């Protein structure tokens, strides 16, 4: 279903279902022989009866079959599990470094089924704010409570749409603009239109004290990247049509939910232009550093992880 400017969802629909996909990958990685990450909460979060249909839809999207005539392009479960394991490991390390430097205020934007408040070794006095839609946050809180899980850090849910006045909602929840903050925008940007991305970065900057940090998963926004994305979209459309003709389920596809309007900011350039010290890591290089072969240089491994600090 096409996105609209003010659409909404729960954990089993639209953008919410993509959080299920991510948690499924974290669960698979955790259960593997040599996991990069350990997320013991991912499996219980995705194993509930109400997510049965989503699990089937994601499995169909991930399936790699001999009938696919463009195998180098096909998304498969191992590729996505590897990518999301590398991504999770990188941003886990980002938070570990941030609190080691003395930061005790954390904001996770579009938190979805993120369980870092429950599984990372947070120092005493750390406050974690999770922002997402109310139904998504409610599902996570109630599911983990049924399993007896308790957050390691102090945790405050901020139920608000990131296209609305989320900074005010964050401050109303107790966020202190005078304290340095570690911000995270993981897997978020494509689900926001360009104007909302600019507004997001502006709000982060305006609400960040000296010593704050931000980490962003960066998807291609330059002209070459946009052309490559358009080519991938055309290839996937052809592949998808053939799957549909064979009677396969193609109802789940995160790319259906992405905004592709022009003017999306490059986070590294944006924060550098606003006085932050920035760095970026190409995901394929990070995967190789961690011993994971980047299975496709055309897939998500071409993304970048951007980090920045406010002097």
Swiss-Prot record:
Set out the biological process GO terms recorded for this chain's protein: methylation
Q: Per UniProt, where does S-adenosyl-L-methionine bind? A: 132, 161-162
Q: Which GO terms describe its molecular function?
A: methyltransferase activity
Keywords (alphabetical) are:
Methyltransferase, S-adenosyl-L-methionine, Transferase
The EC number on file is: 2.1.1.-
Please name the Gene3D superfamilies in this protein's record: Vaccinia Virus protein VP39 (3.40.50.150)
State the Pfam families in the record.
Answer: LCM
- Provide the top EC class: transferase
So what family is this one in?
Belongs to the UPF0677 family.
Its biological purpose is as follows: Exhibits S-adenosyl-L-methionine-dependent methyltransferase activity.
Q: Can you name this protein?
A: Putative S-adenosyl-L-methionine-dependent methyltransferase MUL_4761
Q: List the top taxonomic levels of the source.
A: Bacteria, Bacillati, Actinomycetota, Actinomycetes, Mycobacteriales
């Amino acid at each position: 279903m096409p996105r609209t400017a003010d659409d909404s969802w729960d954990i089993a629909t639209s953008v919410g279902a993509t959080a299920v996909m991510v948690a499924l990958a974290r669960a698979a990685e955790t259960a593997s022989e040599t996991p990069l990450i350990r997320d013991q909460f991912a499996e219980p979060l995705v194993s509930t009866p109400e997510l049965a249909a989503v699990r089937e839809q994601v499995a169909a999207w991930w399936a790699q079959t001999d009938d696919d005539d463009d195998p180098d392009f096909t998304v498969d479960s191992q590729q996505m599990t590897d990518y999301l394991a590398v991504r999770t490991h990188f941003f886990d390390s980002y938070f570990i470094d941030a609190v080691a430097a003395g930061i005790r205020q954390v904001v996770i934007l579009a938190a979805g089924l993120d369980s870092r408040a429950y599984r990372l070794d947070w120092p005493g006095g750390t406050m974690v704010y999770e922002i997402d839609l109310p139904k998504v946050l409610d599902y996570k809180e109630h599911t983990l409570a049924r399993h007896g899980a308790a957050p390691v850090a102090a945790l405050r849910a901020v139920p608000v749409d990131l296209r609305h006045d989320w900074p005010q909602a964050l401050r109303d929840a107790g966020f202190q603009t005078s304290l340095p903050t570690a911000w995270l925008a993981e897997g978020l940007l494509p689900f926001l239109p360009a104007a909302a991305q600019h507004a997001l970065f502006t709000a982060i900057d305006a609400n960040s004290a000296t010593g704050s940090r931000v980490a962003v998963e960066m998807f291609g926004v330059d002209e070459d990247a946009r052309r490559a994305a358009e080519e991938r979209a055309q290839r996937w459309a052809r592949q998808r049509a053939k799957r549909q003709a064979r009677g396969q389920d193609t109802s789940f596809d995160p790319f259906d939910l992405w905004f592709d309007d022009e003017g999306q900011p490059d986070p590294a350039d944006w924060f550098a232009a606003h006085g932050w010290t920035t760095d970026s890591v190409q995901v394929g290089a990070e995967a190789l550093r961690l011993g994971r072969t980047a299975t496709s240089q055309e897939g998500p491994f071409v993304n970048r992880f951007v980090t920045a600090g406010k002097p």
